[in-house]
Amino acid sequence: MRIINGSVFDGEGFVEAADVGDGDVLDAAGCYVIPGLVDVHFHGCLGADLCDGTGEALSTIARHEASRGVTAICPATMTYPEEKLAGIMRAAAAFAPTDNEAALVGVNMEGPFISPDKIGAQNPAYVQVPDAAMLRRLQEAAGGLVKLVDIAPEEEGALAFIDEMADEVRISLAHTTADYDCTRAAFEHGARQLTHLYNAMPPLHHRKPGPIPAAFERDDVTAELIADGVHIHPAMVRMAFRLFGDDRMVLISDSMRATGLEDGVYDLGGQDVTVRGNLATLADGTIAGSATDLAACLRWAVREADIPLESAVKAATANPARAIGVDAERGAIEPGKVADAVLLDAETLDVRHVVLRGRLLA
């Protein structure tokens, strides 16, 4: 496919599109042309969830995400027993996308190795201490698709788990009560990511700094951030980008099955979630994921939080691809990589067209 006109993201900024390539012509006048988006932390959409453990659910998710410009997905599990997680992993391993479905490039294990004291919307009944043998069994069931594993580093055996598994899978700190020193220790042992920055962790405090400063002090640690207009105030989004720099921020949607549907009550990890607009909450008011997609998060970050477009694009494409080790094939528009691209309206930043594996989606 040939894309003419428009402004193309080259990894650092935007350049005018060159009239190169073969095949059908796509006129990108009035658009920004960016790489296909990569969401490494979300749960589902259109009534489907990764944890449904079926090919049908994965197909629904992959089709909707592709239509929204998310061409590579790494959906997240919830906290469940091993038997349930194994079924989810087997379904993921068996999934093969059709022409209009996003590529399943990984699975994110958000539970069960988390803290019961920072449970969020996870089910406390199934929380357990980190277990390397269990993770290896699940990785085998997934055919190697597990790319991210969340862990609360203060829990029993967590640092030993990181020592053993950090060379096999990316370890992210999540749903944690860890203080600054514990977090630093986890990074020294090999953890390399902080899950949904600010959420489900001790807040920044001048005498009890907590996980956030421990993360930004290390150049090899990335931070996820939910830019949905609900989870985080715009000022805190700006602060995160300034602290970490745009090479270390990973935008995520953390979307759940209500995304793309009307307001109502939906299931997330076996618990009822009430959705009103972009706000998804448990009965006690706890925020329970989001009801938006990564393209909308990118737009909100730019238009409402004043993040430079170039920085937001990095955080939704190259950075997540690098975080889960698929950057050799995805996250940039360049020779040798999968031909995924998204055309954003230059004025509204709405998704106008999606190119998926070299084909224009209808």
Where are these predicted regions, by residue range?
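Divalent metal-dependent hydrolysis catalytic cores, especially in the metallo-beta-lactamase
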Residues: 43, 59-88, 102-115, 142-156, ...
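Active-site gating loops and adjacent loop-to-helix segments of metal-dependent hydrolytic enzymes
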Residues: 63-74, 115-143, 185-197, 201, ...
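N-terminal metal-binding scaffold of metallo-dependent hydrolase/deaminase domains
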Residues: 1-25, 348, 355, 359
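C-terminal cap of metal-dependent C-N hydrolases
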Residues: 6, 322, 332-362
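His/Asp/Glu-enriched, well-ordered alpha-helical/loop segment
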Residues: 213-223, 229, 241-253, 258-344
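Active-site core of metal-dependent hydrolases
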Residues: 136, 140-261, 361
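Conserved, mostly hydrophobic/aromatic
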Residues: 30, 41, 65, 109, ...
